[in-house]
Amino acid sequence: MMGLGNGRRSMKSPPLVLAALVACIIVLGFNYWIASSRSVDLQTRIMELEGRVRRAAAERGAVELKKNEFQGELEKQREQLDKIQSSHNFQLESVNKLYQDEKAVLVNNITTGERLIRVLQDQLKTLQRNYGRLQQDVLQFQKNQTNLERKFSYDLSQCINQMKEVKEQCEERIEEVTKKGNEAVASRDLSENNDQRQQLQALSEPQPRLQAAGLPHTEVPQGKGNVLGNSKSQTPAPSSEVVLDSKRQVEKEETNEIQVVNEEPQRDRLPQEPGREQVVEDRPVGGRGFGGAGELGQTPQVQAALSVSQENPEMEGPERDQLVIPDGQEEEQEAAGEGRNQQKLRGEDDYNMDENEAESETDKQAALAGNDRNIDVFNVEDQKRDTINLLDQREKRNHTL
């Protein structure tokens, strides 16, 4: 039974085997198809790769050619670079030499410049010191100028006061002289009247004798009348002349006293020339007719003026002692003072050479004001000259620096 069953099964198995075989054949065919398709693809790829290799070889040959060309060019460029580098090195060496030379020159210039700077610094310090001294001198000069201006104003006020006093004294003397002249005229009139009376008495005594001799009586009184008329007509004339002479004399004395008062401060300030003093002393003082009396009357007033002028320097001594002037400025101020004194003396000589006419107070004050202005102008000019000289010196020093 068992055998029969297995036989049956073996009778049924071939179709399955066939199916399996067909399936295997199909699978194998599919695999073959796949493999053949892959091989075709691979062949195509191989062909492509071969083409690429050929192309790469061709390109490689071209690249090698280009490489050779580039190497030649590189060698040429290297040679050029070597040449350029050698020329550059030569230029650098030359530039370095020039730089070193210039550096040495600049170092020398710097050293000389430093020396000059030190010298200029020393000069600047000295100039600053000199400038400070000059400023001190300028301040001292200004102080001295202010002191001199104060002193000059004080002298002017004293001169004006002295002139007023002298004028008052002159007016008093004019009044005294006029009174004396009137008294002298009156005394002369009295003496002449007494003389005439004595003559009339002397003539009246021999009158009877003349009548006895038969001389006319009317002639004598006519002569007496003429004499009296002449004496009366002549008596007023001397009085007017005396008054005029006295006025002229007083005016001359006033002018001479003013000259003496003006000369005294100048003598105190600067010594005059000996010839100038002799001219002042030799000038005539008296007037007409009353020369001796004029000189005698003038001496006490001149002495009073001299005493006042001598007292004034004693009062002004401390102020003068306070004025401290350097040596250079003393010489400049002495030169300026000598020029001013010469101009003043010339003005006084011109004033004395003119006719001795009476001047009013306004004229005198105007003359004094003119002198003050002239002196102020001289002071301003001196200051301008000093400043100009200082500026010129500074400019010269700046140019030298």
From Swiss-Prot:
Residues 286-295 have a biased composition (Gly residues). Glycans are attached at residues 109, 144, 398. Residues 36-401 are lumenal. Induction: Up-regulated in response to viral infection. Induced by the E1A adenoviral protein. Residues 1-12 are cytoplasmic. GO terms for cellular component: endoplasmic reticulum lumen; extracellular space; Golgi apparatus; plasma membrane. The keyword Membrane applies. InterPro entries: GOLM1/CASC4. Residues 228-238, 298-312 have a biased composition (Polar residues). It is a single-pass type II membrane protein. The modification Phosphoserine is found at residues 187, 309. Its main location: Golgi. The chain crosses the membrane at residues 13-35. GO terms for biological process: nucleus organization; regulation of lipid metabolic process. Residues 178-401 are annotated as: Disordered. Glycosylated. Unknown. Cellular response protein to viral infection. Interacts with DYM. This is Golgi membrane protein 1. It comes from Homo sapiens. The gene is GOLM1.
